């Protein structure tokens, strides 16, 4: 956990340990705030880090101007929390696509359960959003499990079902390989796979 008081030496130390981003959890009151995004983005950009945003749709809409100004890559958690039942018709979806089009934004295909109104096993509403992301920008997607699902206290989702959703969202093996292997290599600076 970092805030704007973190030293450059500490950021460099963390970089040496493999840290590649700062997560702003704006879904809950906590250690990170929207006001920290720009100054921290500037400081970690030269390290090649990204800023990761976990926030409800209304909060992302509030900070969209900040996100348009930051220099570092952006990663949106949980399909960018596109609200259901509006899905791709919600204004946030257009905001996210516009940021993707700028070439520095990624979306994490994770948390299909986070904003669904339909639920398991198909999560058909969230799945529809994920499929459009795959169609429009497969080169800007990474997958995540969100295990151990800290936001879900009582009814933890089935991780096998969540992983299998990727077969529906990205039916072509080469696209899944891109999402699971090539894109994380690019985003996190992993060594290229053979």
Language-model regions: role of each:
Residues 1-47, 53, 90, 124, ...:
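Mid-domain alpha/beta scaffold segments of enzyme catalytic cores
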Residues 113, 147-150, 182-186:
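A short, acidic, flexible beta-alpha connecting loop/helix-capping segment that sits on the rim
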Residues 4-5, 28-32, 82-85, 114-117, ...:
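Short, small-residue-enriched loops and turns at beta-alpha junctions
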């Amino acid at each position: 956990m970092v805030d704007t008081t973190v030293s450059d030496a500490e950021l460099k130390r963390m970089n040496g340990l493999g840290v590649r981003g700062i997560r702003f959890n704006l879904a809950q009151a906590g250690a990170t705030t929207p006001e920290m995004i720009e100054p921290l983005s500037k400081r970690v950009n030269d390290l090649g880090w990204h800023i990761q945003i976990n926030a409800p749709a209304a909060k992302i809409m509030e900070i969209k101007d900040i996100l348009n100004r930051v220099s570092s890559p952006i990663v949106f958690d949980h399909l960018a929390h596109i609200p259901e039942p509006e899905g791709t018709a919600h204004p946030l979806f257009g905001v996210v696509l516009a940021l993707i089009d700028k070439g520095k934004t990624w979306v994490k295909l994770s948390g299909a359960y986070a904003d669904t109104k339909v639920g398991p096993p198909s999560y058909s509403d969230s799945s529809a959003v994920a499929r459009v992301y795959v169609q429009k920008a497969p080169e800007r997607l990474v997958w995540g499990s969100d295990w151990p699902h800290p936001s879900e206290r009582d009814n933890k989702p089935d991780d096998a079902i969540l992983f299998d959703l990727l077969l529906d969202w990205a039916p072509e093996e080469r696209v899944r390989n891109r999402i699971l292997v090539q894109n994380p290599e690019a985003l996190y600076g992993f060594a290229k796979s053979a």
